[in-house]
């Protein structure tokens, strides 16, 4: 086709996401099967080697409507091995576990980890790693790879570094892996840096990713502090101790370690700002102008 000539397409993969956060006009199994069948036929007519790449966010987002019989009808209407599925949000829900491994269709296990490019210390990293290891063992021969589906780049690197390395290093002891990461980041063996990273791994990076951030990143408003989007499951005092341990390192010459210092420090200060803002709101509501003036 003219489009193929212009773009010189060689991979034969076509990303198509019908019903993504959109209701189907008809929820009958026959209608859903007809939709997926016609989608595949349309790309096959243009490219006989076409493969359809489909994210499965809709099965999670509209899980009450996307029942197992409906999912099965939608998937099985496409010829075998012509529909590749992205198990989109495995850090929260693994769809393969509830669909008989996507009824035999090839799929990719994906770690989302970030919504909207928000920069915050979040991600149930250890739990997600265990889920991935289980998938690699029990996910079936149609599990074809590991991927990430983050909604923004230049976000927290650590979760992706840990998760994606499991493609090469399955069943590596987590404690040893974290120590190696700490040594690599700082450029030497530093017990304080190792301790800091173990606390980050075991106690800080434990929250299932959602649209989280720190208050300075949100539009300012009195008595509105985006509590649902700034809440943490750890104590900021604990994170401050992690930052202190990182600052005990003998060297900060490596960029990776400087990024660690910035990442943790930014989160500590961002979390603390929430406390300051709540106190500010209290003073304004009470018209305590002397207290406000005293705080500068």
Where do the PLM segments sit?
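Long, charge-rich alpha-helical interaction segments
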Residues: 209, 213-222
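Catalytic-core regions of glycoside hydrolase
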Residues: 1-197, 206, 223-240, 285-294
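Extended, positively charged loop/linker patches that create polyanion-binding surfaces
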Residues: 200
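Histidine-centered catalytic/metal-binding microenvironments
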Residues: 227-296
